[in-house]
């Protein structure tokens, strides 16, 4: 403290009082002014607070440093260090009945007079007071006093003197300290280490020294210029800050050889550094002639593996006032609150507001932290926006094993919730593609199986100029219409559309029955009409009208259909054209559009966007010529690709066009889950290698990991390797011998190594299990488990490399090749480890390595070490 610039201190146990000290001591009381007016004589500190002067003490001249007594004292007991080296106990109260009244006025006098630079009360034994003095060649610079010691004249020389000529009260002058440290050196700063009552950290002239009062002849020290303002982080007692000129040094007492971090300030010298008592790792610094306080936030980082790893810090500056700041003091309990004082004793109450940290979890939970408060954004009861989010949908679908049904592929749309018609169309398309590919491969292997997955666009192009039309009779009507003769390619297209089953039979009856069972009577009637079976269409509509939930309008439509004659200029055609515009169901509309259209002109059916793509394509295959069909399919494909409509996969197949369509779909919805499963279903190798496909797959894998669906991600990887053998990953890790460097598991490979398979170490043909407790190459023993002290090794059961070719390998659940509990596991930092089961059991209750004398926090090195799979947790 300087005699010209004031310092400021909060009372440790009186959170509404603070002391300002320069040439005199002033005690202030802080009051809130939120709901009240400013009292007369009060000083405005901020918009919400004001200070009232309670008392002034001018009895201690030549003050150089002040320290508040750490124990509770309503009269605010203070220790004052003076320019002559004396330490005086004084108070700012007027209660003469205080329990500390016998201490007030007591002086602690060094042997030789010199300036007292710093004072520090012991936080564990509050009666111990350490004083740091300037250098004297024949005296110590660090003196530790006991303010309540009972001295006798035989032990400690004492004398009673008057404080001044006008005073009548006397006090004790104590001249014998408890401890004397730091001979022939100067002490510039002091602080007690909170972890031990008898450890004192001192900033000497050229070094930082840790004194142990149990053995004062020895000290631990490090040479440095940063010896001023030593202070201990209240939340991390091994972290200490000190400064010199414009640099702040951060020390770790566990590795005291050099600073773990050096903070370079402005060219101006520092005057004060202080840790925040309410916030972990927040350090405030002040430079001379500055109105800015710089804050350093020491971020929490994982335990460093390398010796040179520095902690992560966030730096920011705050400006509590416009004038230069002489000193500041953190409030002991209010979060991030401080009082600053200027050289002319103007004070300001200031709060450092925290940055708001947002956290958006993979399961769509939003939380943010501000100071000590943690807030969560919850969804309103009537708000279903979360259910519409694609991430939530993908997570629920993953729980239902969506996409993994490779036998009945169409069922995947049910696993997705059976709500999206595009997904339903997609999975039925993929189901038909798989079904007819297998059927074609059985009939003629390698012929047209791959064409199926290329989509209807490629199928139609392969048959250009090969189809002619012919006249066909209507069923239930004396009329004929032109229909294209169905060659093999058009039949395949109708099969992929789902209208007909596999085989040469083109009967749509089974398809109509399935539509009726699903309640899609309007669609069934339209399909029947497109197949020139007007009688069946009328029958379906009548049945729908007479059902429990039937629509009476279906009877009206059925009656209208029954009056169809095929005449171009009839009143019926005119009325149906008007009725068509009033119908809401798209299939009823296209029925009248078909009946009222001219031969070869079916735009009213083909371009009705509310009708399923597969029905429009099937209609086109029956009624359009090759040229018209190719032109229509090309145009429709481009529309589907641009819109990202999954129904278009029927046209594009799993080709490059399909990837383009899926890219538009992912851009529109973000559904990388469906994109991944779809592309894996039957795409050729060049399509699977497309970087867009790989991007979707890897992003979906990352999503599963982020959701902690590790088992689901493993299932996806297995599913992927089955459908795309080239994606099967190579072995990522193997255990090698420390002596010869060979893999210890080579003996279990499928090909024995020159007759040295592992079976030679046991009895030939013996069913007894052997253990790989030594290297198969050099026979050196493997490391021992840190807990059971048995050599690490995995029981081997029916090892493929050590059995005869005609023997079956037993890989049942009870006799697997390697059980997880017996697997090798070790820490990448300290290299200690053992059986996985033992390690898991140990680290359920411990964070430190089980090996004696090893202090490695093995489990804390991995940030996911304490996570558990979340696949059983319902959202």
From Swiss-Prot:
- Coiled coil where? none
Keywords attached to this entry: Lysosome, Membrane, Metal-binding, Phosphoprotein, Repeat, WD repeat, Zinc, Zinc-finger
Segments forming C4-type zinc fingers? 735-781
SMART domains cross-referenced by the UniProt entry: WD40
Q: Quote the Pfam families the UniProt record gives.
A: MIOS_a-sol, MIOS_WD40, zinc_ribbon_16
The positions annotated for binding Zn(2+) 3 are 827, 830, 858
GO annotation (BP), single: cellular response to amino acid starvation
Kindly give the PANTHER family that the UniProt entry links to this protein: GATOR COMPLEX PROTEIN MIOS, WD40 DOMAIN-CONTAINING PROTEIN MIO FAMILY MEMBER
Name of the protein described by the UniProt record: GATOR2 complex protein MIOS
Q: What is the lineage of its organism?
A: Eukaryota, Metazoa, Chordata, Craniata, Vertebrata
